[in-house]
């Protein structure tokens, strides 16, 4: 199988579709249209023009980086594409992260990321979240 690797964000519609297909939480098209251009880095994998895997890095570009939106179409899971997405992300991070930079993620599949060298921070730290009502 031939895959095309593009270091660009997908379209907002593709992004929203792949998130849902891969089992991630749904995002509105409006949110995606605002968020994607603010990515520090993105990798998209395509087969015959269709988006089948993706991942992004967001943050301030120096002190904090967050790995987000790592998703693989269920029809292509188990082929190493998630690992390839993370290899591209890790190459980017290794080229820009400074001493003391903090790289984080909310890992839906911690065992997958641990195989790639990422470590759980608990019990020394705990992830937290807070939901806000839509502003529109």
What residue spans do the PLM features occupy?
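Short amphipathic alpha-helix that is part of the acyltransferase structural core
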Residues: 1-30, 124
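A conserved beta-strand-loop-helix scaffold within acyl/acetyltransferase catalytic domains
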Residues: 31-71
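A generic "binding-loop/recognition-motif" signal
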Residues: 63, 108-111
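Conserved acetyl-CoA pyrophosphate-binding loop and the N-cap/start of the following alpha-helix
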Residues: 76, 80-88
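Conserved GNAT acetyl-CoA-binding A-motif
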Residues: 86, 93-107
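Conserved catalytic-core motifs of GNAT/GCN5-like acyltransferases
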Residues: 100-104, 119-136
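Conserved active-site tyrosine of GNAT-family acetyltransferases
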Residues: 113, 118
């Amino acid at each position: 199988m031939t895959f095309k690797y593009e270091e660009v964000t997908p379209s907002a519609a593709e992004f929203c579709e792949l998130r849902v297909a891969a089992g991630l939480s749904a995002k509105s098209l409006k949110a995606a249209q605002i968020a994607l251009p603010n990515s520090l880095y993105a990798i998209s994998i395509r087969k015959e023009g269709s988006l089948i895997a993706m991942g992004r890095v967001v943050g301030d570009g120096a002190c904090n980086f967050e790995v987000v939106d790592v998703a693989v179409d269920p029809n292509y899971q188990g082929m190493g594409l998630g690992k390839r997405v993370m290899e591209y992300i890790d190459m980017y991070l290794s080229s820009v992260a400074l001493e003391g930079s903090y790289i984080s993620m909310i890992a839906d599949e911690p065992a997958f990321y641990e195989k790639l060298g990422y470590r759980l921070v608990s019990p020394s730290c705990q992830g937290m979240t807070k939901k806000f009502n839509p502003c529109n």
